[in-house]
């Protein structure tokens, strides 16, 4: 029989031991099995350990991520979980993502928790890591942040955990590799106190070169070295063996081999270290890989060490000037549909804007000048978006480096391209001024004087955009009056024999306008969908350009339908029906889920569409109009053009500084 004091001591020790072993189990295994759960005690122990692993700038970080916050992530329909609630295994991914956000930026995550934004930011973070390229870049940056925020680094561990190891563990779990699984494996190592390495090891760069260009390890043959040098654009042709013309099989064909090797650069490899192949490293990153001090610089001996890294970056094409979108600029699938639908809805409301023509029937002259201002604004917005925003993006001149990468060079290249393309608009504007001044200063034809306050010089292109103010007036006939009477009263010139032959065309005009507008709006929807799939900034710029050209276009279509003899109700319905096809184009672009390459092609086609509509449809409608106040019209045209270009120029130059 043990003494009472000894018995109490054993019981106390047993309780302490129970608390000590109440640490979380292997989360990745729990997630892979799909069974089991974490109770509140395990969660609390996990969060305490997580906080202990992080060091903030002003000392230890506060424990702002509570058990209730985590349980709310797992059960969004129950924001106030019961005390006996547990975190099911299928919700461990959300816990891992929340922990990753905390490890990346503890102070910001605590503010998000206080504002109630943690759940939405967790969903957004998982969405940004969907593609393999984004996952590699995002997790590499996360590992570097964990290194910076680590409270202490284990000294007894020879190698630290890197991204390839995390991917291996997620793949070995027996489930498909995804960002959530990799984050769960990462959280396991954080809890176990492992150190992390966010950049590849120096040996990786040598392995990469030999993996691509050595068919007989461990050495690179002369033939393979020739192909490697050809791919790097260095070296000359060796003429020493050209005397032997009989053995042509020994001659190298660098073009053919280089093309073959180039195709291999973009294919997956068996080596687990290939996860780094698409990572573009800055000079600071490369110096960090080799442990070089920024103050001391690179010595001749160190230069020989880091040369393989420079060769690897050239061979992999990781830093090639293709458009890449910063992770924080990308939208989740839900946000793409939401913002795209809102933008398309605003564009479709342009069709209803035609009702303003009825309210301004007695002030048709003012309506005419408003239409001309919107026409010039549309030309400025379309050409500005095409030249200053879409073309640099399609050609890869407007790139955004990831966090931690040097941005000065990219800003220089993108900014220089923007100013040069602005010079293209400058040449366009100079010749616009020349033609406008010629039209203003040269004597006008007598026929144009007889045409009234504003006519259009006989130019037939874009009939819906070249209507005189008289065509915008409401009919003073009753609803019982025939449409032919309406047309005859508003346009008595139709009574002559020549225009009678045009009556059949006028009857077909509503259907032609509706069909053409429907196809046009479908293409606009495709452009908006591809733009929002790329980034919210590209979506904003494209939506602005589409809105600016749809507003005068829809107003002109509405007036043309009234001019053809349709009732107000029917004209409005046809205009709305054609406008709604933009939603079809939007959802097709979003549902297909095109990648960066597909987005570039769609935006390239949209660029051509914008330039065609601006230069072949709307610009002639501006230039061929005749008015009794030509200088006022000239002023309004300049205001619209310069206003559209200014907005798109500012958006192109300063879009990186726009944050929400």
UniProtKB/Swiss-Prot annotation:
Query: Residue ranges, Cytoplasmic compartment?
Result: 359-376, 442-511, 567-571, 621-630
Membrane side Extracellular: residue ranges: 23-337, 398-420, 532-539, 593-599, 652-660
Going by the UniProt annotation, this protein carries glycans at 192, 219, 272, 657
Q: Which GO terms describe its molecular function?
A: identical protein binding; zinc ion binding; zinc ion sensor activity; zinc ion sequestering activity; zinc ion transmembrane transporter activity
Residues of the site described as Essential role in Zn(2+) sensing = 524
**What subcellular compartments does it reside in?**
Cell membrane; Recycling endosome membrane; Apical cell membrane
> Known consequence of changing residue 382 to P?
Reduces zinc uptake activity. Reduces plasma membrane localization
* Sequence ranges of Basic and acidic residues compositional bias: 236-267
Q: Which residues bind Zn(2+) 2?
A: 521, 524, 550
- Ranges for region Disordered: 233-273
Q: Which GO terms describe its biological process?
A: cellular response to zinc ion starvation; intracellular zinc ion homeostasis; zinc ion transport
| Residues making up the signal peptide according to the UniProt record | 1-22
Tissues expressed in = Highly expressed in the small intestine and embryonic visceral yolk sac. Weakly expressed in the stomach and liver.
Q: What happens when the gene is disrupted?
A: Knockout mice die in utero during early development. Mice heterozygous for a null allele exhibit developmental defects similar to the teratology of zinc deficiency. Slc39a4-intestine knockout mice reveal that total zinc is dramatically and rapidly decreased in these organs whereas iron, manganese, and copper slowly accumulated to high levels in the liver as the disease progressed.
Q: Where does Zn(2+) 1 bind?
A: 520, 524, 549, 553
Task: Please give the record's induction comment.
Answer: Up-regulated under conditions of dietary zinc deficiency. Down-regulated under conditions of dietary zinc excess.
Q: Which cysteines are joined by disulfide bonds?
A: 56-61, 64-110, 160-195, 280-319
Which reaction does this enzyme catalyse, per its entry?
Zn(2+)(in) = Zn(2+)(out)
Task: Work out whether the entry's keyword set contains Disulfide bond.
Answer: yes
Q: Which residues cross the membrane?
A: 338-358, 377-397, 421-441, 512-531, 540-566, 572-592, 600-620, 631-651
About its domains, the entry says:
The two metal binding sites M1 and M2 that are halfway through the membrane form a binuclear metal center. M1 is essential to Zn(2+) transport, while the other, M2 appears to have an auxiliary role presumably by acting as an additional transport site that can modulate the properties of the primary transport site. The binuclear metal center plays a key role in Zn(2+) sensing.
- The protein's role, per its UniProt record: Selective transporter that mediates the uptake of Zn(2+). Plays an essential role for dietary zinc uptake from small intestine. The Zn(2+) uniporter activity is regulated by zinc availability. Also exhibits polyspecific binding and transport of Cu(2+), Cd(2+) and possibly Ni(2+) but at higher concentrations.
Q: Which family does it belong to?
A: Belongs to the ZIP transporter (TC 2.A.5) family.
What's the protein here called? Zinc transporter ZIP4
The species this protein belongs to is Mus musculus
